[in-house]
Curated annotation (Swiss-Prot):
Any matching Pfam family: L51_S25_CI-B8
Protein's UniProt name: NADH dehydrogenase [ubiquinone] 1 alpha subcomplex subunit 2
Xref: Gene3D superfamilies: Glutaredoxin
Gene (name only): NDUFA2
InterPro entries: NADH_Ub_cplx-1_asu_su-2, Ribosomal_mL43/mS25/NADH_DH, Thioredoxin-like_sf
Modified residues (N6-succinyllysine): 64
Cross-referenced PANTHER family: NADH DEHYDROGENASE [UBIQUINONE] 1 ALPHA SUBCOMPLEX SUBUNIT 2 (PTHR12878:SF6), NADH-UBIQUINONE OXIDOREDUCTASE B8 SUBUNIT (PTHR12878)
Family listed: Belongs to the complex I NDUFA2 subunit family.
UniProt GO cellular component terms: mitochondrial inner membrane; respiratory chain complex I
Residue numbers of N6-acetyllysine PTMs: 64
Assembly and interaction partners: Complex I is composed of 45 different subunits.
Length: 99
């Protein structure tokens, strides 16, 4: 799981500085992201207490996972119509450097 991967320090080896999740409070395309946050955010944050994990809600925004690395490098993964499990896999890919 993403929390387990991050707790092993995988993201730290890549210079991961911050994770941001953008989503809409109401859109059907963000439903899986909302489910992910409700079910897995606490575990993820506990396993990564030193890593900023930011949740940004905005009306009509397309859901995305953003990762900021050392030297200001950023990557993003679109999460539109993803299930909570697909969001978890996307986060695992970011933490392992595959995204």
């Amino acid at each position: 799981m993403a929390a387990a991967a991050a707790s092993r320090g995988i993201g730290a080896k890549l210079g991961l500085r911050e994770i941001r999740i953008h989503l809409c409070q109401r859109s059907p395309g963000s439903r899986g992201v909302r489910d992910f946050i409700e079910k897995r955010y606490v575990e993820l944050k506990k396993a990564n207490s030193d890593l900023p994990i930011l949740i940004r809600e905005c009306s009509d925004v397309q859901p995305k996972l953003w990762a900021r690395y050392a030297f200001g490098q950023e990557t993003n993964v679109p999460l539109n119509n993803f299930s909570a499990d697909q969001v978890t896999r996307a986060l695992e890919n970011v933490l392992s450097g595959k995204a």
